[in-house]
């Protein structure tokens, strides 16, 4: 039997997939919960419950999975619209502000989220926080030749920034765009996500950071009640 966290992820992935309609251009997110959603979309295409779906992926990993499942794919440049994007998050606060980028895919994730007519975030209840960055580091994608300079400027903003190192190769993590990632912690968390998102992105050498502000239209939360997995439609505050 799946553990409780997996059950929560499965429940919320199914609930999100129920919003997918025939003929949609669908933003396919990254991460473990989004992967379950992609698998369900593939299953519904195979058995005819869904037809004429076109996917736009947010990571190479998601592209591989979707292709294996037979989901037709297009690049972001090849489509005029995204009807619905479904993606996970590493942290979600009560105002639907997010930190994403644990998988170093936040640049493409943000591009897809901004293009989407509707952006639905799928998380399990462990991802809900009162303030961002108290438990999860903020990813900042930087040009390889500028990471030390950006690190210094982030420190001037009060952040502690470390270069993300790879787990199964020597050296740093390299993003799908060929850049590096600084993981940043701010003492006391982030009290102004919108302002900090803009400030960081204005640092020369920064491509994008993992703060997603004003993008999420809905947050679906997988949770366990009385031992049974269910889904809550989070109310924005």
UniProtKB/Swiss-Prot annotation:
Catalytic activity: aldehydo-D-ribose 5-phosphate = D-ribulose 5-phosphate
GO terms classed as biological process: D-ribose metabolic process; pentose-phosphate shunt, non-oxidative branch
Gene3D superfamilies the UniProt entry points to: 3.30.70.260, 3.40.50.1360
Cited InterPro entries: NagB/RpiA_transferase-like, Ribose5P_isomerase_typA_subgr, Ribose5P_isomerase_type_A
Annotated catalytic residues: 109 (proton acceptor)
Residues where substrate binds: 30-33, 87-90, 100-103, 127
Source taxon at top rank: Bacteria
Assigned GO CC terms: cytosol
Pathway assigned to this chain's UniProt record: Carbohydrate degradation; pentose phosphate pathway; D-ribose 5-phosphate from D-ribulose 5-phosphate (non-oxidative stage): step 1/1
Enzyme Commission code: 5.3.1.6
Molecular function via GO: ribose-5-phosphate isomerase activity
Keyword terms: Isomerase
Similarity section: Belongs to the ribose 5-phosphate isomerase family.
HAMAP family, alphabetized: Rib_5P_isom_A
Name of the protein this chain belongs to: Ribose-5-phosphate isomerase A
């Amino acid at each position: 039997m799946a553990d409780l966290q997996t059950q929560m992820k499965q429940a919320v992935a199914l609930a999100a997939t129920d919003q997918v309609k025939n003929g949609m251009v669908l933003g396919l997110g990254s991460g473990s919960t989004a992967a379950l959603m992609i698998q369900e979309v593939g299953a519904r295409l195979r058995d005819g419950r869904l037809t004429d779906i076109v996917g736009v992926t947010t990571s190479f990993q998601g592209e591989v999975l979707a292709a294996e499942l037979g989901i037709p794919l297009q690049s972001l440049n090849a489509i005029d619209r995204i009807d619905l994007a479904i993606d996970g998050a590493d942290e979600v606060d009560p105002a639907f502000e997010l930190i994403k980028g644990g998988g170093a895919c936040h640049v493409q994730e943000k591009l897809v989220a901004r293009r989407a007519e509707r952006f639905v975030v799928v998380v399990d209840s462990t991802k809900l926080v009162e303030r961002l960055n108290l438990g999860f580091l903020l990813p900042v994608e930087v040009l390889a030749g500028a990471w030390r300079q950006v690190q210094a400027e982030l420190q001037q903003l009060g952040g502690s920034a470390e270069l993300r190192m790879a787990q199964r190769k020597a050296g740093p993590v390299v993003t799908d765009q060929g850049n590096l990632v600084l993981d940043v912690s701010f003492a006391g968390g982030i009290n102004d996500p919108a302002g900090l998102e803009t400030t960081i992105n204005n640092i020369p050498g920064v491509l994008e950071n993992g703060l997603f502000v004003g993008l999420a239209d809905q947050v679906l939360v997988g949770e366990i009640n009385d031992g049974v997995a269910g889904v809550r439609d989070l109310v924005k505050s």
